[in-house]
């Protein structure tokens, strides 16, 4: 039986979809619904991780502590988890989250910068936390290079390492190649995870591919008995940056059809998506001309709303901004460059 570890990211990546404006009460309500539906883990933080609330990334409607405490009040079976980006959050922030009830953390770096996660992963492991490495913008490193970065995170103490498609740019073959590369280098006990975005409408398909390839140990052929648990990120109604993440309720329905062990009530997830999350979306989370441009150009999905504001302010097409950001290979943390790009494009149009 293929075993899945489903982690909901509605209350972290989903922050991007509503400009980090969840109230503590909304977090409490959504977390309770996810817990009742049987989800394994629920991630809670500002969209850019612990301590992400700032001028650069956007201020939250509440603090990380308020959001985490609200979720902790209602969870009965789901693991409370969070995300930390070294350089934004610190070990002190992680310690504070742990004291509030967080037992699991993902340490996120750019796909070529695993070495900056060493202290954070090691601290989490030494302090009894479940810890994963999270290699963002995975399309910007080739399979062998990405696997080498994953091996570094494993060496620091990560229980799991993710292929993280922050730009929604990976095709199904790209996911297969990267997961296969992970299998060749990671120890059998190290889990493999997938974090998909839906910018090319491949969020669910890419997650399925990751499971099919990631569940096999070593060089075993596809279809061999599953030997590894695969972690899959998803969110209610796809709530997340860009066109959103793999929609949780859709992925669980597909997993059910595959006969995979997921432990969730698909109807309860459908209800939570429709009744609790979709009404909060001031901008529909969907594939449209702007979010498709993110995936087409391979741009960090959380750049979307920043780019839309810059486009409106400077009178340029948001797609032009996104394509230029992709051409310049901008990555998470370079949000300030979005305005520079918009100004450059506006200047070109005037000359």
Curated annotation (Swiss-Prot):
Gene3D superfamilies: 1.10.8.60, Aldolase class I (3.20.20.70). Mn(2+) binds at residues 13, 195, 197. Residues 4-258 form the Pyruvate carboxyltransferase domain. Signal peptide: none annotated. It comes from the Bacteria. InterPro entries: 2-IPM_HCS-like, 4OH_2_O-val_aldolase, Aldolase_TIM, DmpG_comm, DRE_TIM_HOA, PYR_CT. It catalyses: (S)-4-hydroxy-2-oxopentanoate = acetaldehyde + pyruvate. Substrate binds at residues 12-13, 166, 195, 300. Disulfide bonds: none annotated. PROSITE patterns: PYR_CT. The record marks 12 as: Transition state stabilizer. Pfam families: DmpG_comm, HMGL-like. Belongs to the 4-hydroxy-2-oxovalerate aldolase family. HAMAP family: HOA. This is 4-hydroxy-2-oxovalerate aldolase 1. It comes from Salinispora arenicola (strain CNS-205).
